[in-house]
């Protein structure tokens, strides 16, 4: 197999892998790098010049995996795009939201390249976005060659899948983003533990030791305890969340706690894209049974819209639990503004429930010490950190030990490392060299072709 990583910045970003098996050409994912802006955030598609792709696979609907898909499809006007049914139900909504954000950033930040694609273009490509069920092998004839592919549930978020490719007698597996343990609203990954000639694996947590005893169930209890203690001292709780997956999981956890009288009495506020996606997950749950979330949760929690009259740096008008995006507290989002309102008072808590890039405001706040001054530059607020800042392990990614165990179970002849920062990939390269010495381990340099 020939493989080229089109994510020019490497690491975790504009995920996009170009592969050729025999005379069959395909791409896995086409994302945007959240650390970049404009065209620099997109994959480098120059290696595809003159190439007619037979298929494009989408592993899941996070923007670092789908955010540049309309651009790729623009250059491949006849290529079908295949994904799971839940991903097909989500993808248009996620792309339309991305276009809206780019229009706003063009106006606010003067990024004249934005939007990279329009709502009309999303509507035009929609007929080429095709669903395919899990665990259902399908033969696909390309222009000059054919393959068989199978999707396997990868946990992570609704619709996430690993992709198994069979070409002649060769078996290849792409894990995508994977979580083996179950979440409150989603079952864990069910990946095939069989021999593969080539394994292409994510490495997100390769540099992260598994904290002892941090089972998701324990973290749920710790989160509810933190909320209750905050409410008892008269404070409010901010829970910054990713709109797709994490918001719905946190709302389900709050619903469970309230149902069993384990959550203090306080209004719960939520708004934005995540609330809209609650409808989508409710629909996915009803149609596929692959998600465990219903709109009944919102009704029984009596969710209120987040107040629009928040003044940065000033106390919110109502004590409550605020479940809002963005998860990394990106500037000019609801979580960013609310953090500026709460961080200076010791009665409040800010509870992070997902990964924060160290270069984002959320990452900066987690790294800061209590008593330090913290600048919310986008709203011109400077406050001394007094609030309780907590991080909870609700990761959507497998531990490095789980991924290593999976690689050992598959006994591949070659392993390709993807979706990880350099230290994460280095850990896997070292461990695999020791435990699978017969396997060729490849950490691809972006835009360089490799034969595996």
Q: Predicted regions span which residues?
A:
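Cap/insert and terminal regions of metallo-dependent hydrolase folds
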Residues: 181-270, 349, 354, 373-440
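Short, solvent-exposed amphipathic alpha-helical segments in soluble enzyme
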Residues: 20-22, 166-168, 189-193, 253-260, ...
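Hard-cation-handling environments
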Residues: 223-361, 418
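Core dinuclear metal-dependent hydrolase active-site scaffold
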Residues: 1-51, 131-187, 313-315, 321, ...
């Amino acid at each position: 197999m020939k493989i080229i990583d089109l994510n020019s910045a490497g690491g975790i970003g504009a995920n996009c892998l170009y592969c050729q098996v025999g005379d069959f050409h395909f791409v896995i994912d086409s994302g945007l790098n959240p650390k970049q802006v404009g065209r620099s955030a997109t994959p480098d598609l120059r290696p595809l010049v003159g190439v007619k792709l037979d298929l494009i696979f989408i592993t899941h609907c996070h923007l670092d995996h789908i955010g540049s898909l309309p651009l790729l499809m623009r250059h491949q006007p006849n290529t079908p795009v295949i994904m799971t049914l839940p991903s097909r139900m989500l993808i248009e909504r996620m792309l339309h939201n991305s276009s809206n954000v780019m229009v706003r950033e063009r106006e606010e930040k003067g990024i004249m390249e934005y939007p990279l694609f329009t709502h009309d273009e999303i509507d035009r490509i929609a007929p080429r976005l095709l669903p395919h069920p899990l665990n259902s092998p399908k033969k696909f004839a390309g222009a000059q060659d054919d393959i068989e592919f199978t999707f396997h549930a990868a946990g992570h978020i609704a619709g996430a899948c690993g992709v198994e490719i069979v070409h002649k007698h060769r078996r290849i597996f792409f894990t995508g983003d994977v979580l083996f343990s179950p979440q409150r609203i989603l079952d864990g990954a069910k990946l095939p533990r069989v021999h593969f000639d080539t394994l292409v694996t994510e490495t997100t947590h390769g540099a992260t030791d598994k904290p002892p005893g941090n089972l998701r169930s324990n973290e749920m209890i710790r989160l509810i305890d933190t909320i209750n203690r905050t409410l008892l001292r008269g404070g409010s709780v901010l829970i910054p969340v990713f709109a797709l997956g994490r918001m719905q999981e946190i709302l389900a956890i709050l619903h469970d706690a309230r149902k069993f009288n384990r959550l203090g009495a306080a209004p719960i506020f939520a708004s934005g894209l995540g609330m809209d996606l609650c409808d989508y997950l409710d629909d996915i749950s009803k149609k596929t049974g692959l998600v465990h979330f219903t709109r009944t949760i919102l009704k029984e929690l009596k969710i209120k819209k987040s107040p629009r009259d928040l003044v940065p740096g000033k106390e919110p008008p109502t004590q409550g639990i605020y479940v809002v995006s963005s998860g990394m507290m990106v500037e000019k989002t609801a979580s960013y503004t609310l953090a500026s309102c709460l961080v200076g008072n010791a009665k409040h808590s800010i509870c992070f429930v997902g990964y924060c890039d160290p270069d984002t405001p959320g990452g900066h706040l987690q790294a800061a010490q209590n008593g330090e001054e913290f600048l919310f530059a986008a709203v011109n607020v400077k406050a001394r950190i007094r609030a309780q800042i907590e991080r909870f392990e609700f990761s959507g990614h497998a531990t490095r030990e789980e991924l290593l165990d999976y690689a050992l179970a598959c006994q591949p002849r070659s392993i390709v490392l993807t979706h990880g920062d350099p230290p994460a990939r280095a850990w896997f390269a070292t461990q695999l060299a020791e435990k699978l010495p017969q396997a060729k381990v490849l950490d691809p340099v972006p835009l360089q072709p490799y034969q595996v």
